[in-house]
């Protein structure tokens, strides 16, 4: 199963505003009529029950929404970019990789139709109609569209099943699953026969439930040994666990303790999953001889144990009856929870500070970071004296010059704003 992938998502950039003038007698330049740019498309993740793995992402890492169109004359706004909906299997967890290297879960798509907005499209830039003032009746300024959000995501598929069969490698998990369901896991007499989770459906008079075999766990699985990380995360989405032990093992209860320790060390909540303990290979003569001894040992530990044979089916019905009983209790508790309403969840990036401008001292002058004005500079011909004059008026209007002087700048010093150099 292809169940973990890193992808890059990019929302659409906003379209740039338009500098244009209508033809009208006695109005300078015919009067401004530049339209705004369209907004860039958003990126969504949506759970789809028709998908079963993340294989679609193996050869396509970058996913982009459409950009917004630029503004047009006659005050016409550009078309918004088309949204991008990325379909993922139910049970997918999306984690964002922050710039500081930290990881943050932003979406857990646990039900069919769950949708999360993970990247906002950039806002369209303003056309020159927005820059009209009493002193500037013919603005030659327009704004570049904002860039869309761009993030690196980790998508992890955690299987969703009612029951997980766990245990050491080669204890008979695959044999038990194939006996109970139509699933056909690989069965052989060597460790790690199963390298990915296998699910099957069990139909009983008490009801239908889904059972999954989680590949064998070994010591230090919580550190990733033996593909431990890949296996352990699947247990977190199951209601309960069948802990299968090998009756021919020298110390089955010690095996159980070691596996449970790995669950706890990986995620303490996993060790709290309800468990039914089953000892396999009761068809083996040695296990039959040890049966009462093993039963007493587990009883002293406060555990009820079921003896089964995944080969002959002995004891399996009794085990399943107990599992079904526990599941009924767990499912009844779930009924009180609110059903998913498929409301679109929205991921909002952490704010990067207040809008406005920031002044920084440089070796040979000063830098003014003003995102809104920089977008105008980026989209304007600053070599044109009239355009440059209008930008300077904006800088003055936003109190940038006064703030520079208060910060220690003196007349004649070089100032950098975006790609424009100017002097105080």
UniProtKB/Swiss-Prot annotation:
Subunit structure and binding partners: Monomer.
Q: Residue ranges of the OBG-type G domain? A: 161-328
- PROSITE patterns the UniProt entry points to: G_OBG, OBG, OCT
Keyword terms of this UniProt record: Cytoplasm, GTP-binding, Hydrolase, Magnesium, Metal-binding, Nucleotide-binding
Which SUPFAM superfamilies does the record associate with it?
A: Obg GTP-binding protein C-terminal domain, Obg GTP-binding protein N-terminal domain, P-loop containing nucleoside triphosphate hydrolases
GO molecular function, a single term = GTP binding
Q: Which residues form the Obg domain?
A: 1-160
Source organism: Dehalococcoides mccartyi (strain ATCC BAA-2100 / JCM 16839 / KCTC 5957 / BAV1)
Q: What is its main location?
A: cytoplasm
Lineage start: Bacteria, Bacillati, Chloroflexota, Dehalococcoidia, Dehalococcoidales
Q: In its UniProt entry, what is this protein called?
A: GTPase Obg
Top-level taxon: Bacteria
What sequence ranges are listed for the domain OCT? Answer: 349-424
């Amino acid at each position: 199963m292809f169940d973990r992938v890193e992808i890059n998502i990019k929302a659409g950039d906003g379209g740039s505003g338009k500098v244009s003038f209508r033809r009208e007698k006695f109005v300078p330049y015919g009067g401004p009529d530049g339209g705004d740019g369209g907004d860039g498309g958003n990126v969504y993740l949506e759970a789809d029950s028709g998908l079963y793995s993340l294989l679609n992402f193996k050869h396509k890492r970058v996913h982009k929404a459409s950009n917004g169109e630029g503004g047009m004359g006659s005050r016409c706004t550009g078309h918004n970019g088309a949204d991008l909906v990325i379909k993922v299997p139910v049970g997918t967890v999306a984690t964002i990789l922050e710039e500081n290297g930290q990881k943050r879960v932003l979406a857990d798509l646990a039900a069919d139709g769950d949708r999360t907005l993970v990247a906002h499209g950039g806002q369209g830039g303003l056309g020159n109609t927005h820059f009209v003032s009493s002193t500037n009746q013919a603005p030659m300024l327009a704004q570049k569209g904002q860039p869309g959000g761009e993030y690196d995501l980790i998508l992890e598929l955690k299987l969703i099943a009612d029951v997980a069969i766990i245990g050491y490698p080669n204890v008979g998990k695959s044999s038990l699953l194939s006996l109970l369901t139509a699933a056909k896991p690989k069965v052989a007499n060597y460790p790690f026969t199963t390298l990915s989770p296998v699910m099957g459906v069990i139909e009983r008079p008490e009801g239908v439930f889904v059972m999954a075999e989680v590949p064998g766990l070994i010591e230090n699985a919580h550190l990733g040994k033996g593909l431990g990380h890949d296996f352990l995360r699947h247990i977190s989405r199951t209601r309960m666990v069948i802990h299968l032990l090998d009756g021919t093992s020298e110390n089955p209860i010690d095996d159980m303790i070691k596996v449970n320790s790995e669950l706890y060390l990986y995620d303490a909540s996993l060790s709290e999953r309800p468990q039914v303990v089953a000892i396999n290979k009761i068809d083996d003569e040695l296990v039959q001889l040890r049966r009462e001894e093993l039963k007493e040992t587990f009883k002293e530990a406060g555990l009820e144990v079921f003896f089964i044979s995944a080969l002959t089916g002995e004891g399996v019905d009794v085990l399943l009856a107990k599992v079904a009983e526990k599941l009924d209790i767990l499912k009844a508790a779930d009924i009180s929870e609110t059903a998913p309403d498929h409301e679109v969840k929205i991921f909002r990036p952490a704010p990067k500070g207040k809008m406005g401008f920031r002044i920084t001292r440089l070796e040979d002058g000063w830098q003014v970071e003003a995102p809104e004005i920089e977008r105008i500079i980026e989209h304007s011909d600053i070599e044109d004296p009239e355009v440059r004059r209008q930008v300077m008026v904006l800088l003055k209007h936003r109190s940038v010059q006064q703030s520079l002087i208060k910060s220690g700048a003196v007349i004649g010093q070089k100032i950098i704003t975006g790609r424009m150099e100017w002097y105080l």
